[in-house]
Amino acid sequence: MAKSPRSVVTTGTKRRRAKVHKEDEPVENENLESEFDVSKKESNGATEPGNEPVASKRPKRAAACSNFKEKSLDLSEKDSIITIKESRVEEKEIEAVNLTRTGPEDGQPCRKIIDFILHDGDGNLQPFEMSEVDDIFITALIMPLDDDLEKDRGKGICCSGFGRIENWAISGYDEGAAVIWVSTETSDYKCVKPASSYRSYFEHFSEKARVCVEVYKKLARSVGGNPQVDLEELIAGVVRSINSNRSFNGTVTKDFVISSGEFIYKQLIGLDHTAGNDDEMLATLPVLVALKDECKSRAGFTHLPAMPSNGTLRIKDGQDKGLTEDEDAKLARLLQEEEEWKMMKQRGKRGTSQKNIYIKICETEIANDYPLPAYYKPYNQEMDEYIFDSDIGMYSDDVPVRILDNWALYNSDSRLISLELIPMKAGAENDIVVFGSGFMREDDGSCCSTAELAQLHSSSSKSGREDPGVPIYLSPIKEWVVEFGGSMICITIRTDVAWYKLRQPTKQYAPWCEPVLKTARLAVSIITLLKEQSRASKLSFAEVIKKVAEFDSRHPAFISSKAPTVERYVVVHGQIILQQFADFPDESVKRCAFITGLLAKMEESRHTKLAIKKKSQQMRGENLNPSAKMGPILRKKLMRATTTMLISKIWGEYYATYFPGDTKEEDQNEPKEIDDDQEENEDNDAEEEVNVQDEKATRTPPSTRSRKSSADTRKEIKWEGQTAGKTVSGEVLYKCVIVQDLSISVGATVTTEDDSGETIMCFVEYMYEKLDGKNMIHGIILQEGSQTVLGNAANDREVFLTNDCLEFEASDIKELVTVNIQSLPWGHKYRKENSEAKRIEKAKAEERKRKGLPVEYICKSLYWPEKGGFFSLPYDKIGNGTGICSSCERKPVGNEFKLLSESSFVFENITYNIHDFLYIRPEFFSQGEGHETYKAGRNVGLKPYAVCHLLSVHGPAGSRKANPESTKVKVRRFYRPDDISSTKAYSSDIREVYYSEDIISVPVVMIEGKCEVRLKDDLPNSDLPAVVEHVFCCEYLYDPANGALKQLPPNVRLVTLTRKVPASKKNKGKQICDIELGGSDKPKDGQSENCLATLDIFAGCGGLSEGLQRSGLSLTKWAIEYEEPAGDAFGENHPEAAVFVENCNVILKAIMDKCGDSDDCISTSEAAERAAKLSEDKIKNLPVPGEVEFINGGPPCQGFSGMNRFNQSPWSKVQCEMILAFLSFAEYFRPRFFLLENVRNFVSFNKGQTFRLTLASLLEMGYQVRFGILEAGAYGVAQSRKRAFIWAAAPGETLPEWPEPMHVFASPELKITLPDGKFYAAVKSTAAGAPFRSITVRDTIGDLPAVENGAGKPTIQYGSGPVSWFQKKIRSDMASLNDHISKEMNELNLIRCKHIPKRPGCDWHDLPDEKVKLSTGQMVDLIPWCLPNTAKRHNQWKGLYGRLDWEGNFPTSVTDPQPMGKVGMCFHPEQDRIITVRECARSQGFPDSYRFAGNIQNKHRQIGNAVPPPLAYALGRKLKQAIDAKR
């Protein structure tokens, strides 16, 4: 194309004129003109007034090759005559330009250059963009712009070292093909073809230019683009467009686009001045800005040496110092980019093939083995696989392995096509492009055969998989492999993005898959045949063909009984057979006579031979997957979170500043769990040795520090004003002190230093004069937000009051700091008012910063790491100057032991008297006992506390000091049913104990708290979902000598029945016995007005609401759930609630529109459209601010959960963003209380950023916040389920304490690390003991009737009564049993299940190593072939195909129980089936009356995603206690 100065172009940086090399005198040329200015300089070289002509030093010529290897050749006389067409050479550029002139020219001349190189003044080749940094010159063949490149080379003029380059530009945006221009003062040059020696330098820049044009095409409406695409879609589209003729993999391509983001942005914003009326301004386009930001965030991803290729470093002197730093930085960046580009190319050139020839399969020869042509019809919601690019790394050769189910392959015309047409070796040339579609999901570690799945149904033959995966379309398939072992045959394909294990093809494509599988089975059979021989080469090709023809017709590899037919089949499909032989580990088989004969036959057939290169041949044009042509309306759109302005601002500003892994300092403050196993390994805690010894955690308690004085005695110090009283020790108090010229008052904030020299900020609580005359300050230490768990998510102007104090002399004060103790009005009514006040405050702070004034801090919360939270400031107790420090008052009372009398003592702040009932650690009675642990049986052998009756106290003899070790108590031991047998424990009340005559002496140190023992008739008649009281019942006497149980004699009296618990002793430790004889706390008719009006978001089937309502705390009036079956289940179980089955983003948008706050709402257009379409009834029923008192919910956990290894997909990222919508509900409604529930990985997900920002968001709203992780198994369910919780309470409310774990459970203490090496655990581990034993599998499901594999009857009869305490509670008054239905296993898995022994701990390791015959006649291995081979890498695959243990616990409940899943222990202890829906529900603590909706997959999903109601009950009960105490 002819260069047009008025065409759409982007330009490089205009260079500042450097000093001339040849002349000493400076030459000024500050106003260089762009080559695209409307007014052009004439080509006659005239200069502007006041400027002298520039004389350039003639650069050295680029180095030429000086060493040629000689080789003798015999040439004919004709061949030895060479006609040389030499191009004319000119020294001066102006003459070369004039000689290539073809007609009249307006403005700056335009030429093209070929065989060009760019170099510096010393002749060293330099990258293209180096012209922005250094003087760069051109050596090239200059040609007329419109001449043919090759035919008219004779018209070209060779010119060496001309220029220098003044600037460069990119054009061709409207045409869709990048054109690169360089300009000197004389002419503009179109860069057509670099010299071979310069190609690698120029290629990098030309690729960047090409990407710029592709991005423009995707965004500019004038060329059919869509400026509203998101970043993932933009990158995927660009990569797909340019990938059709790229030589390296897609991961590098995507990274290359991102790494060029800043370059792209700078180029495209230059086009804004040419934009049409319909085009948006590119400079402010969100997706383009996001691309630039993503590029910047990756800066520093690699740190390569920034050295020129010649190894020398040039330092330029005498230039403008103001530019030195910028130019040095640019030089380093360009050199690093060049190095990175070279690494990309080197990686892209790596081949995997070992031979240079690949014999192609002929399509016409195999056509008869395939069906008639058919065409693929794509799903409406297929997504581009590039969106799911894993971002493994810029230079990684690795790509992830995923699974593709329900798949089909087709060409660019959507015609179904065979895999055989794709070369099986990477790098092979190929003229056919094959695409694919299917449902992608995570690699779950399963080893299902492609062959097996093509013939059999999936593991759930009735309704298929619950989670089919994400529908996607693939980029071109690069290679494929066949893996085999035993009877298993697996096909895996590779694209630019991932390896895909192929599972079941679509029904339509199955006939196209069968010939490939048939050939693979044939290859396996031939290998088996050869291995049976004494040596592999014993059988020739013909003999093998003969033996294959003798196969029985029922043989899986049967082709035909005619040898010619078999031979034809083997030869035309030979490449599959060759690959399988090449991968076989036996060298004799690889080189056998059969393979030699097969290769010869294939060559005889004149099959096409494809060259295998180090890089694959580039395809011309855009070979796009035809599914990509579907309109955007048909493709699945991911809805971004709807947020309020405040939440968007907090999270947006954070991500604009910080990025994952920026600095080591950030990592130090990242909260994480000490027990950092992934979610899927939650049950592997048992595989570690559980230490049942008491774990006395070493915590750093709040303290009062007195620093050693380093007072400056020269400072003038004096008290000001009258005295303000005296301290308790008689020292005089004052309100103000003058230090030099500083006036320090009580309530001010000052800085001083501690003994280590660290500067500390202190709030002045009071000041006094010591008896020796020293002027003293008692201060409470303030911490900056970055020093708390918030880390870098904290407001940099906010400080937090702590419980640490410091006493220091007034002369130690360094400076006075402004800290405003902030208290804003609370409630939804004040949202906008407070927001405006904060905006003004922030503007003021920024103005102070610009002026260099000191920071003015704010303080509105107390940081209490020992309690894991932030609390409201005690405004009325701080800064009073009374000599009493609120921080000192909050310090925990010491745990010292006190022997009060011969009948009472104090231990760990609990007072014990004779006749009290107490707990003794189980280790005192079971020292030396051990037990075997295995997956889901880890609670076996763990014991609860022993219940004892205190009879007497005996201090140490003589003058020895009394301590917990030397002081002993005599107690009567009460036995538990589990001390007798597991059978007795199963049939007894969990609270039952047995009186005995055993009197023992126990050291006080073994005591763990107080409890009560009552007669059974005096127990409260409770139907609570969890046991929460330290109360036991007794009606039998036990004799351990003979094991006899007798009725409790009438003369035995349980003394504490006649004693009431003093009010002063209530709510202290384990002596809590505030029994509510009314039983259930669930709100009764007429009492619901005392419950909190609750909104449950991400409600699921209602596990959280169920538990909270049973506690009497809340009444769920509104619920939001996206999935219809779960929403139906919620509505059925909570008919009083208005259930909105809709995306929460739509609901929030609708609510804010309803209330007239649309201007404060940030949402997608889709959310706005769907909100506008809601019915009037729905909108009428929507809650509004002021109605909601409590918001709770668990944002989708797939992105956070380690169980979902596919958590980097955009969908998971969007789900993670749902935390923003959840927080926006809280920000808009401002309820009194807020509860967030999530998987434990939520705390450490995304390097803790999400967790920190959640806390920071709630604090910015004004809430009090506390956080912790709890184990559901310790609250009365037979399941390991660790969950993270965040409580928030409005100012003036009381944050609830964490519920005390009541059941023994083998889980470690769940700690969250804090800055400075501290940690926080919400509750202690109960592995060493707890008030009650753990709930077992038998307790949970032992009464349920037997059902078969695939049982589907929705309602059946129980058949027998409940036995265990748990069963009686969970059944309540239900007469029939619902949802006792089981997923149906396929035939092979059912056979495997039947072979798993019915004893504890058995799994796939116990399967016999043998083959079984299926009903189809196929012989298959009982042991899944892939498990033994990969066991070492996967913890021996413990639990897969595992049986539950009657005396153990369930593993973590999942949404799809299956024997080869992440939690594979899903077989009933005694029946040959997967556990039923009802059994899963019971493992979560759902009562039998609770109903689930949808099909069996829906029901399992609802249960697996739910919060166990007993855990929710325990949480709700503690909040109810906090509210009641305040009342």
UniProtKB/Swiss-Prot annotation:
SUPFAM superfamilies: S-adenosyl-L-methionine-dependent methyltransferases (SSF53335)
One Gene Ontology biological process: methylation
Reaction catalyzed: a 2'-deoxycytidine in DNA + S-adenosyl-L-methionine = a 5-methyl-2'-deoxycytidine in DNA + S-adenosyl-L-homocysteine + H(+)
Skewed-composition ranges (Acidic residues): 25-36, 664-692
Superkingdom, natural source: Eukaryota
EC number: 2.1.1.37
Tissue specificity remark: Expressed in roots and inflorescences. Expressed in roots, panicles, anthers, pistils, endosperm and imbibed embryos. Expressed in tissues containing actively replicating and dividing cells, such as shoot and root meristems.
Alphabetized Pfam families for the sequence: BAH, DNA_methylase, DNMT1-RFD
Signal peptide: none
Protein location: Nucleus
Function summary: Probably methylates CpG residues and maintains DNA methylation. May be involved in methylation-dependent gene silencing. May play a minor role in the maintenance of DNA methylation.
Name used for this protein in its record: DNA (cytosine-5)-methyltransferase 1A
